[in-house]
């Protein structure tokens, strides 16, 4: 079967990077059954031939109007599809969609008519915000990192920036590679507009957001970047839990030590692009 990836090495590289990351998600135990979702903006790789490809699905509503997505193209994991299968066959377990001129609906154009993720409204709302603000970020990742989800079941970590402070204090790399910390979204029904709106508010100041008792959403320059930030935070959560399992609350780095890391390495306090 002919694929849109044929003779398009740059697009193919992006799709296969997505496949690589989904393999990592499965290996880490973050992607049970069909858990998790991915959406990546691939508009820059769409040539005139791609833009002329007829739809292979009916026009479907997004559920909201997103003015900055007009004519944009996204690779989306399919609803009900497993990350472990996507890792092997990305174009059979995900699809490329085109946003129509009304900015409120989409159609599938390649390779097969795979219905996008059930969290599509949230993912596209984030993509709309990134485009609106001129960000260079292209990818959104939703997954279920075990230790971070576990921490979200404890009220202490849902207050203010308490979870961020604890995670930053576990190892300098967390502060260095997740300098915006982790935002908190109180529990909301999965796939709901309320969840999308709350996530959008937190993503304005964080690259990774915790959905209470559910999972994380991360944005990044590409899907590997979004994965790396989530992975770094989850490592810190694992260190915290290992220390607790030895019978004590870990000391963590002091506020002064963390400030020294921030100052010496000139860590950003806002999204770099």
Model features per residue range: what roles?
Residues 1-273:
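Glycine-rich flexible loops
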């Amino acid at each position: 079967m002919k694929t849109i990836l044929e003779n398009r090495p740059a697009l193919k590289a992006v799709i296969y990077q997505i496949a690589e990351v989904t393999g990592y998600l499965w290996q880490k135990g973050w992607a049970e059954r069909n858990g998790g979702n991915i959406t990546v903006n691939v508009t820059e790789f769409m040539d005139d031939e791609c833009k002329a490809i007829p739809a292979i699905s009916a026009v479907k509503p997004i559920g909201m109007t997103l003015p900055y997505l007009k004519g944009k193209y996204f690779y989306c994991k399919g609803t009900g599809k497993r990350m472990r299968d996507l890792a092997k066959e990305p174009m059979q377990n995900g699809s490329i969609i085109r946003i129509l001129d009304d900015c409120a609906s989409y159609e599938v154009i390649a390779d097969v008519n795979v219905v996008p993720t059930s969290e599509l409204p949230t993912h596209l709302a984030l993509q709309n915000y990134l485009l609106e603000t001129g960000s260079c970020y292209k990818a959104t990742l939703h997954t279920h990192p075990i230790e971070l989800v576990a921490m979200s079941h404890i009220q202490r970590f849902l207050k203010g920036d308490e979870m961020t402070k604890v995670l930053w204090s576990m190892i300098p790399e967390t502060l260095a590679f997740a300098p915006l910390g982790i935002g908190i979204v109180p529990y909301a029904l999965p796939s709901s507009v309320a969840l999308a709106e709350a996530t959008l508010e937190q993503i304005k100041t964080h690259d990774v957001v915790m959905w209470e008792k559910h999972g994380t959403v991360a944005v990044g320059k590409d899907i590997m970047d979004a994965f790396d930030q989530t992975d770094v935070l989850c490592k810190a959560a694992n260190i915290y839990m290992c220390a607790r399992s030895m019978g004590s609350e870990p000391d963590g780095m002091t506020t002064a030590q963390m400030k020294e890391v921030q100052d010496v390495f000139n860590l950003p306090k806002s999204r770099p692009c």
